[in-house]
Amino acid sequence: MARVTVEDCIDKVENRFELVLLASHRARLISQGASITIDRDNDKNPVVALREIADETLSPDDLKEDLIHSLQKHVEVDEPEPDPASMIAAGGAAAADSEEQDDLPETITFDQMSEEELLAGIEGLVPPEKSDDY
């Protein structure tokens, strides 16, 4: 990359590290088939990306937003908040349901094993073969 190209870009993007991130993201987009906004002049994709930033054919803010969006794994969706009145009505119905469920006995059962059955099971275990791992 030509030093002149990087120095031209510093006027547009003040932080060199951010410039590298934006230019590399744009170069990847070009490699994936995005159309370029300047003449290629037999330059490679990173140089083309830097020249696009230097010539201001792309907005650094748009590139930054696109980079952030491409790195996000979970996109937040703004959902409308429910009405307080409907929440109060739903809360009363849920309280009635929970009172009915409290009256039901819990049916959790575990397998019961006597001490003799446990000892017989332990004696029947085969020890692992020794290895040189430890």
UniProtKB/Swiss-Prot annotation:
<dbReference type="InterPro" id="IPR006110">
    <property type="entry name" value="Pol_omega/Rpo6/RPB6"/>
</dbReference>
<dbReference type="GO" id="GO:0003677">
    <property type="term" value="F:DNA binding"/>
</dbReference>
<keyword id="KW-0804">Transcription</keyword>
<dbReference type="InterPro" id="IPR003716">
    <property type="entry name" value="DNA-dir_RNA_pol_omega"/>
</dbReference>
<feature type="region of interest" description="Disordered">
    <location>
        <begin position="76"/>
        <end position="102"/>
    </location>
</feature>
<dbReference type="GO" id="GO:0003899">
    <property type="term" value="F:DNA-directed RNA polymerase activity"/>
</dbReference>
<comment type="similarity">
    <text>Belongs to the RNA polymerase subunit omega family.</text>
</comment>
<keyword id="KW-0808">Transferase</keyword>
<dbReference type="InterPro" id="IPR036161">
    <property type="entry name" value="RPB6/omega-like_sf"/>
</dbReference>
<protein>
    <recommendedName>
        <fullName>DNA-directed RNA polymerase subunit omega</fullName>
        <ecNumber>2.7.7.6</ecNumber>
    </recommendedName>
</protein>
<comment type="function">
    <text>Promotes RNA polymerase assembly. Latches the N- and C-terminal regions of the beta' subunit thereby facilitating its interaction with the beta and alpha subunits.</text>
</comment>
<keyword id="KW-0548">Nucleotidyltransferase</keyword>
<dbReference type="Pfam" id="PF01192">
    <property type="entry name" value="RNA_pol_Rpb6"/>
</dbReference>
<dbReference type="GO" id="GO:0000428">
    <property type="term" value="C:DNA-directed RNA polymerase complex"/>
</dbReference>
<dbReference type="GO" id="GO:0006351">
    <property type="term" value="P:DNA-templated transcription"/>
</dbReference>
<keyword id="KW-0240">DNA-directed RNA polymerase</keyword>
<comment type="subunit">
    <text>The RNAP catalytic core consists of 2 alpha, 1 beta, 1 beta' and 1 omega subunit. When a sigma factor is associated with the core the holoenzyme is formed, which can initiate transcription.</text>
</comment>
